[in-house]
């Protein structure tokens, strides 16, 4: 063996080691730079979302739009529907990641338009005197920027309406792909003149920073004067907490109870309705069992806590909501997770004549509309 060659080989070995060290160092620096840029971008995003966070007051006066010629009297019949329309993107084809499904984007623009048109058409067919709608988008990525309020209100002639925002985020940064921009709320329509509308903030169960990209739930209170009477028909549209540990629902339900009781104590007629994300303890839901603990399951309102002045009303013959862990299209309807979480609370001076959940096969929303007819007591 030649000594010179051994020395040359040894030198080459050291040279290669140094080169590898430099390469590793370069890679680590590059990776560190990427992490630093990502961290900086995340912090900037959190800062922007913090500055632009939707922070409604505890009570806010809302605009009432439109014109209605109808007048209400004691002894009159009154019909009302509640419907969570799933921002026009949760039809029978949809599943959703928050319920165990796979998708964030659940409908293209054409599908959203088709769903909203069908929902508007069904409302015209039902011809209620008033409607409580939830998950109505004004300008959201998930519904392709369509103003669903304008689309629906445009089909209601001779009516008044009010809108309360409960979800407004410049950019929701999760999951991947992200939810993105959301501008959404609850909409009340009436064939009678509504004198005023008010947004009442409900307790938010989420702390910072999760709170900044989450819903800010509320009640929307509208008032219809009753002719030749000092009473009002008070309409309360609601959409209570869904994805919490249960404490949020409880706190919001407690506040709802107080708001309704205050109106009852004034002698007013009261109808509260919407998506409670809870069943009612006075309603048999055994026909809709929890088929898997892995799926979302609702809370339960103890109706006895509301006393005898307020009655809970829904129709258990048809489910009001379906799970979004899988599409409804192509699934076995006999082995599907259903819920009964939409309905009404009415004051005892109203006689409930009927309540019926419309079985629409969840074609255009993951909820079915619930129609109730009452008579105002004299």
Please describe what each predicted stretch is:
Residues 17-150, 154-155, 163-174, 178-183, ...:
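N-terminal, active-site-proximal structural segment of metallo-dependent hydrolase catalytic domains
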Residues 102-108, 136-138, 203-211, 239-247:
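Surface-exposed cleft-lining segments at the edges of enzyme active sites
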Residues 2-13:
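Positively charged N-terminal leader segments that act as targeting/secretion signals
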Residues 244-348:
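Metal-dependent phosphoesterases centered on the DNase I-like endonuclease/exonuclease/phosphatase
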Residues 168-233, 237:
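A well-ordered secondary-structure block
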Residues 79-85, 116-145, 189, 222-224, ...:
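Active-site beta-strand/loop signature of hydrolases that rely on acidic residues for catalysis
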Residues 154-157, 181-197, 223-225, 332-351, ...:
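Conserved beta strand-loop-helix elements of the APE1-like EEP
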């Amino acid at each position: 063996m030649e000594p010179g060659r051994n020395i040359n080989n040894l030198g080459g070995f050291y040279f290669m080691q140094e080169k590898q060290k430099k390469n590793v160092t370069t890679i680590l620096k590059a990776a560190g730079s990427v992490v630093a840029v990502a961290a900086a971008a995340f912090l900037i995003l959190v800062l922007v979302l913090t500055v632009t966070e939707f922070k409604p007051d505890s009570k806010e006066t809302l605009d009432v739009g439109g014109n209605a010629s109808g007048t209400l009297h004691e002894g009159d019949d009154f019909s009302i529907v509640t419907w969570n329309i799933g921002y026009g993107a949760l039809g029978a084809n949809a599943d959703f990641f928050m319920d165990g499904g796979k998708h964030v984007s659940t409908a293209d623009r054409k599908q959203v338009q088709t769903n909203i048109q069908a929902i508007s058409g069904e409302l015209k067919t039902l011809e209620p005197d008033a409607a409580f709608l939830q998950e109505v988008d004004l300008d959201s990525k998930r519904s392709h920027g369509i103003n669903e309020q304008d689309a629906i209100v445009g089909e209601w002639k001779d009516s008044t309406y009010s809108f309360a925002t409960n979800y407004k985020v410049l950019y929701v940064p999760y999951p991947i792909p992200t939810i993105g921009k959301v501008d959404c709320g609850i909409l009340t329509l009436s064939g009678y003149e509504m004198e005023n509308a008010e947004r009442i903030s409900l307790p938010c169960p989420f702390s910072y920073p999760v709170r900044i990209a989450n819903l800010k739930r509320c009640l929307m209170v509208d008032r219809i004067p009753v002719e030749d009477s000092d009473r009002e028909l008070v309409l309360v549209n609601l959409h209570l907490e869904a994805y919490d540990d249960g404490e949020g629902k409880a706190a919001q339900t407690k506040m709802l109870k107080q708001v309704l009781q205050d109106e009852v104590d004034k002698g007013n007629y009261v109808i509260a309705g919407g998506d409670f994300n809870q069943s009612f303890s006075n309603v048999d839901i055994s026909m809709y069992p929890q088929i898997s603990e892995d799926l979302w399951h609702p809370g339960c309102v103890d109706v006895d806590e509301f006393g005898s002045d307020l009655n809970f009303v829904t129709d258990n013959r048809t489910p009001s909501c379906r799970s979004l862990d899988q599409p409804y299209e192509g699934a076995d309807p006999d082995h599907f997770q259903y819920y009964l979480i939409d309905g009404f609370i009415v004051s005892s001076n109203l006689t409930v004549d009927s309540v019926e959940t419309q079985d629409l096969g969840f074609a255009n929303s993951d909820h079915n509309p619930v129609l109730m007819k009452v008579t105002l007591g004299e």
